[in-house]
Amino acid sequence: MPSPAAPRPNRQSRNLQVGEWGEQLVCQWLTQQQWHILDRRWHCRWGEIDIIARSNPPLPGQDSNTRLAFVEVKTRRAQNWDADGLLAITPQKQQKLWKTAQLYLKKHPELAELFCQFDVALVQCNLNSNSPSKTVHVQDDLQVTTVEINQPIHVRGYQFMLLDYIESAFTL
């Protein structure tokens, strides 16, 4: 009698993990850009916002507005159907994000006066190839010294790349 096959990871569970790593990559990049991460995966009855970040107070001579970014992260494989996730930000999705952001601001009135923007981060994820690149070994969290747009980072058999970060991607 053949021995039972080793359990295979659930596809949905694997996709969630890949999505979390994509979000973590964007958090690392935002931190490098002098943003402070306030919340991750904040959810309410209307939906979920992947990342909520506040710009650090500006230096003298810079724009004086501290901003609050509600960031939607789309992690996709190459050759996907939806322009690396950009087409998934439909008007309906934008409306859900808007309502979710409004509820977040109600729960955090100290942030309500900040300039708010809706940003979109597009992350590409593929199974690792043999191409030379920075390899990152992770336990639970993605820890990278530098994340750059269009620079691959290898994590647990996957290659991630922040393709684009679109500030103020949409307004309502």
UniProtKB/Swiss-Prot annotation:
InterPro entries per the UniProt record, alphabetical:
Restrct_endonuc-II-like (IPR011335), tRNA_endonuc-like_dom_sf (IPR011856), UPF0102_YraN-like (IPR003509)
Mind telling me which Pfam families this protein's record contains? Answer: UPF0102 (PF02021)
GO MF terms, alphabetically ordered: nucleic acid binding
Q: Which CDD domains match?
A: PoNe_Nuclease
NCBIfam families (UniProt xref)? YraN family protein
Give the family, as the similarity comment puts it.
Belongs to the UPF0102 family.
Descriptive protein name:
UPF0102 protein AM1_3954
Q: What is the lineage of its organism?
A: Bacteria, Bacillati, Cyanobacteriota, Cyanophyceae, Acaryochloridales
